[in-house]
Amino acid sequence: MEEEAMHGFTQYTPTMIIFGKETQKQAGELAKSLGATKVFVVYGGGSVVRSGLLDQVTASLQEAGLDYMTIGGVKPNPRLSFAREAVKKSIEFGTDFVLAVGGGSVIDTSKAVAHGTANPETDIWEFWSKKQTVTKSLPVGVVLTLAAAGSETSDSAVLTNEDTKIKRGLSTDFNRPAFAIMNPELTYTLPKYQVGCGVVDIMMHTLDRYFTQTENNELTDEIAEGLLRTVIRNGAVAIKDSHDYNAMSEIMWAGSLSHNGITGLGAEKDFAVHQLGHELSAKFDIAHGASLSTVWGAWAAYVYDAKPARFAQYARRVWNVEEADDVKAAQEGIKKTVAYFASLDMPTSFSEATEIGLKTDEEVKKMAHGCSYEGTRTIGSFKVCDENDIYEIYKLANK
């Protein structure tokens, strides 16, 4: 009997992409064309100030005749407390458009500000804890400075509650930005570590979709495999020279495509590795990309036998593995992926990540308990993992 074909799907990608050099100077006119009058500008650390980017963006807002307010200080693994404070200021300002100038954490915070400003009666954590549903929001624009999360076109956003050390994601079409300005030159100042984290994150957004039990989904598979080959090739260049415009262009565009849904259309998604990583980021404040690279090899080694042929296909098409035996090919593909992460100077186990301090088996069990929402949920679909499976994966990674 024929295997099940691709699943039915709905794909919604309303984000306008403005790609190329000097495009950040169009921010004001773009916001104005979407009806903006009072723009709330969100950014992270001092790099956008030191580089002059923030001045360029605010100048474009002034030239467009728009009123604006800025707020800086977003940190990696965006904090709920900061987002709440930003919402208060945004409401007081009378914001009708939110502009993110930064990477994934800044964009996710901006999405939270947009939801909170449009729903002043609701605490934003209610949306992330799934107690309330987003039914209205403000438009968000993006000036991207970091190729990684893909939040500039995605329907997702994450926040970390520092009080409870819980990191949660929210998926809704209200999260999709109205426009994304993407100038690869804005990534030139990134430290090597952030470039590596970005490459890992981009790969993971596709890998977490690629490893699926869904069969006969040829075009989506080819798109995913092509994206992965492109990122692997250009990531090796960018990690040595982040001023390589061609390499950074390919990586930046791949980051958007990897998380706007296209690399997993028609297939059941897995995303177990992201859930495993979120628990690490929440507890230890490790960079998102690094949290994923520490645990991917352990996850892959634990689950590949649920369908060795899928991992073998990945190994042959992405890594050019010639091994005929599916199990051996699968294992070789996993080794090559982990070795690639290491070549980017990314941690591939907990012991290589200085932020992660799991010293006892009880601590590992506690992490698994948290990741499984205290034993109330499973993660993944390629191989459904319960609390014990999560514990075994963390234990493998804790070497």
Segments from the language model and where they lie:
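Active-site segments that bind and position negatively charged phosphate/pyrophosphate groups
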Residues: 209-339
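A glycine/threonine-rich phosphate-anchoring loop and its flanking beta-alpha core
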Residues: 119-216, 313
